[in-house]
Amino acid sequence: MAAPSMKERQACWGARDLYWRCLDDNAEDAARCQKLRSSFEASCPQQWIKYFDKRRDYLKFKEKFEAGGFQSSQSTENS
């Protein structure tokens, strides 16, 4: 498989960005963004889609973690 051309990469990234923006605007409701998801899948290699999905999950986790949305499972009071 040949590497995607610059135009193909830009189309992929653009489709990804539109899909992610839709998810952000619709409280992660994937059903409302199905058309953009289909466009994203049609524009990007399958391996990239897997990577971008994992990347988004990580970025959302990191954002919540940094905002203090997670508590430590171990108590530090006894240390």
UniProtKB/Swiss-Prot annotation:
**Where does this protein reside within or beyond the cell?**
Mitochondrion; Mitochondrion intermembrane space
Recorded GO molecular functions are: copper ion binding
- Sequence motif Cx10C motif, residues: 33-44
Q: State the GO CC annotations.
A: mitochondrial intermembrane space; mitochondrion
| Disulphide bond pairs | C12-C44, C22-C33
Motif Cx9C motif: which residue numbers? 12-22
Classification via SUPFAM superfamilies:
Cytochrome c oxidase subunit h
Give the main location.
mitochondrion
Q: Which UniProt keywords apply?
A: Disulfide bond, Mitochondrion
Quote the subunit structure annotation. Answer: Found in a complex with TMEM177, COX20, MT-CO2/COX2, COX18, SCO1 and SCO2. Interacts with COA1, MT-CO2/COX2, SCO1, SCO2 and COX20. Interacts with COX20 in a MT-CO2/COX2- and COX18-dependent manner. Interacts with COX16.
Q: Which PANTHER family match?
A: CYTOCHROME C OXIDASE ASSEMBLY FACTOR 6 HOMOLOG
Q: Which family does it belong to?
A: Belongs to the cytochrome c oxidase subunit 6B family.
Known role: Involved in the maturation of the mitochondrial respiratory chain complex IV subunit MT-CO2/COX2. Thereby, may regulate early steps of complex IV assembly. Mitochondrial respiratory chain complex IV or cytochrome c oxidase is the component of the respiratory chain that catalyzes the transfer of electrons from intermembrane space cytochrome c to molecular oxygen in the matrix and as a consequence contributes to the proton gradient involved in mitochondrial ATP synthesis. May also be required for efficient formation of respiratory supercomplexes comprised of complexes III and IV.
From the Swiss-Prot or TrEMBL record, give the protein name.
Cytochrome c oxidase assembly factor 6 homolog
**What organism is listed for this UniProt entry?**
Mus musculus (Mouse)
Q: Which gene encodes it?
A: Coa6
